[in-house]
A protein has these predicted regions:
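Bacterial N-terminal signal peptides that target proteins for export
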Residues: 1-8
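Active-site-adjacent loop/helix surface patches within enzyme catalytic domains
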Residues: 103-142, 151-153
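Catalytic cores and adjacent binding grooves of peptidoglycan-active enzymes
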Residues: 129-131, 135, 140-212
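Active-site acidic/histidine clusters and adjacent loop/turn architecture
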Residues: 51-116
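N-terminal module-boundary/linker segments of secreted carbohydrate-active enzymes
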Residues: 23-69
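A generic structural signal for short, non-catalytic loop/turn and secondary-structure boundary residues
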Residues: 22, 51-56, 117-119, 137-139, ...
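Hydrophobic h-region of N-terminal signal peptides that target proteins for export
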Residues: 12-21
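Structured loops at beta-to-helix junctions and adjacent beta-edge loops in soluble globular domains
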Residues: 62-64, 127, 149
């Protein structure tokens, strides 16, 4: 191979790698930075939180919105699932999988209902299961909700829908965009990483929910 050919091949391979380099640059895992922890204190990281800050990780991702725009997203989760989430969201981004928004629930004052109504994908929030004294998997940073408005928690035979604003999406026999089903790419991806999907629960269906 001549010198010009070698140069052109090297240039081609370099240019080919740029999208992947840019993509990797949009994704990261780190300990929770001080500025982020200040946003969390008194909100998702409430007084009496039993999860040490050192056990949590701050995950930065890129995602495609419902309108097809590329946006930055941020997630706080337990360190045990941080790399899983990083890989999952990299795959979702490569597949141009639409996610409305990915913001810390602290932007909604850690109000789960407000976050769900805004169709916000989120993970850590130190709270109890509604109507129970048990800690939610979200309290441990081991659960994440994806596009929750379109994929509500349905219980009591459909009489109860959470968020209530998602009632139009409670009947899963209907066809509509962004519906999480067993055959959906996102669901398969989470399952491949060892997560359990709330859409498979027996006594209620939490279609937005993945936990480990």
């Amino acid at each position: 191979m001549t010198m010009p050919q070698t140069f052109l091949l090297s240039l081609f391979l370099f240019l080919l790698s740029l999208p992947m380099q840019a993509q990797r640059e949009g994704f990261s895992v780190s300990p929770v930075p001080d500025a982020v922890f200040q946003r969390m204190k008194g909100k998702s990281y409430k007084s009496g939180c039993t999860v040490p800050r050192s056990e949590l990780r701050y995950v930065r991702v890129l995602h495609h919105t419902l309108e097809g725009k590329v946006k930055h997203g941020e997630i706080v989760c337990h360190r045990r699932i941080a790399n899983d989430l990083l890989e999952i969201f990299q795959e979702l981004f490569r597949a141009r999988y639409p996610i409305a928004q990915i913001r810390l629930i602290d932007d909604f004052d850690a109000d789960d209902t407000r976050s769900m109504e805004a169709n916000n994908t989120s993970c850590f929030n130190f709270r109890r299961v509604k109507g129970s004294r048990s800690l939610s998997k979200h309290a441990l940073g081991l659960a994440i909700d994806i596009n929750p408005l379109f994929n509500p928690h349905v219980s009591q035979g459909g009489a109860r829908v959470n968020p209530a604003a998602g009632r139009a999406y409670a009947d899963r026999r209907k066809n509509f965009p962004h519906k999480l089903t067993a055959s959906d790419f996102c669901v398969k991806l989470f399952k491949a990483h060892g997560f359990r999907w709330g859409g498979n629960w027996r006594h209620s269906k939490d279609y937005q929910h993945f936990e480990k």
